[in-house]
Amino acid sequence: MVIGLSHYLTVSAILFTIGVFGIFLNRKNVIVILMSIELILLAVNINMVAFSAFLNDIVGQVFALFILTVAAAEAAIGLAILVVFYRNRGSIAVEDVNMMKG
C-alpha cells in the first residue's frame, strides 16, 4: 500500500478539525486554545509539504519552515504572556484576560 496525497490531506483535515473544535468547545483555558492553534498550523504545514512533494516543488517545504518558525515564536510569546498573567492574577481563565490593561 502506497501512501498517497489523499492520505496526507485526510490527516491534515482531521488535525485541522480537531484544532477548530478545540477552540470552539473549550473557551475557558488559554493553554488549550494555544494548543489548538498549533494543531491548525500543523495541519497547514502538512498540506504545504504534501502538495510540495506531489508537485515536485520545494517552495512549499520552504514556506512550511517559515510557518514552523512563526508558530514557535507564537508559542513562546504566548506562554510567556500566560506566565506573567498567572503571576499577576493567579488564574489563566479566558474571562479574566479581557480585564488586562494596556
UniProtKB/Swiss-Prot annotation:
The chain crosses the membrane at residues 5-25, 31-51, 65-85. Its main location: membrane. It is found in: Cell inner membrane. Gene3D superfamilies: 1.10.287.3510. Its EC number is 7.1.1.-. It catalyses: a quinone + NADH + 5 H(+)(in) = a quinol + NAD(+) + 4 H(+)(out). The keyword NAD applies. It is a multi-pass membrane protein. The keyword Translocase applies. InterPro entries: NADH_UbQ_OxRdtase_chain4L/K, NUOK/Mnh_C1-like. Pfam families: Oxidored_q2 (PF00420). One of its GO terms (cellular component) is plasma membrane. Keywords: Cell inner membrane, Cell membrane, Membrane, NAD, Quinone, Translocase, Transmembrane, Transmembrane helix, Transport, Ubiquinone. Belongs to the complex I subunit 4L family. This is NADH-quinone oxidoreductase subunit K.
